[in-house]
Amino acid sequence: MAQGRNDEPVQQALRALSGQHPGWGFWKLHHRLRKNGLVINHKRTLRIYRALALNLPRRLKKRVPARVKQPLAVPATANSCWSLDFTSDVLTDGRRFRTLNVLDDYNRELLGVEIDFSLPASRVVQTLTRLVDYYGCPAQLRTDNGPEFISARLSEWCEQQGITLHWIQPGKPTQNAYIERFNGSFRRELLDAHLFRSLAHVRQLVEEWRHDYNTQRPHQALNFMTPIEFKQAA
């Protein structure tokens, strides 16, 4: 291909996106590339798309086992179930960072927030190991079907710890409602309320907010007690 050298970044991005999202068609891939600033003209995307034979029918590989619907029960004790999820935001210099939020469903206590530019499965396991050392081992973890959560690394760690790893059904965020509701508050009250200069700045403000959330903020679902008060009253 005469334009191969100039097209290489687009080729790499198309291969990666197509591998991550095998059900995506041309237009969804094109708009993702355009959003990322790699292409503007759809004709260029289409030419590369066809050259890579991505327009040919493919057998979709089943990535995850079937998920079983599980009612969102109210735990009777602490460490019955922890919910995990990611959020993200940007620093003032435009770099995007992620947060891994870990919540105890029993008293809605925010056990920890891991923050970095990248949080692969290995960091998820490191974070959980640290939290287990401090809080004890949960009976179950509830997550969505993100790549970090369906990784063999996390599954093996949970098996070693005797923890049941429960994935919600795809497209059913209400099955992880505790952390979903928390994420809404976390974004409104913290992420959207501040301009972050650095990861150190994010970590400082998040830890201050976490302490206030756990010790000062009353929760209607907890009879207007704070998470710590609710756990101490049990």
Task: Specify the residue positions occupied by each region the protein language model found.
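Charged DNA-binding/catalytic regions of mobile-element recombinases
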Residues: 1-234
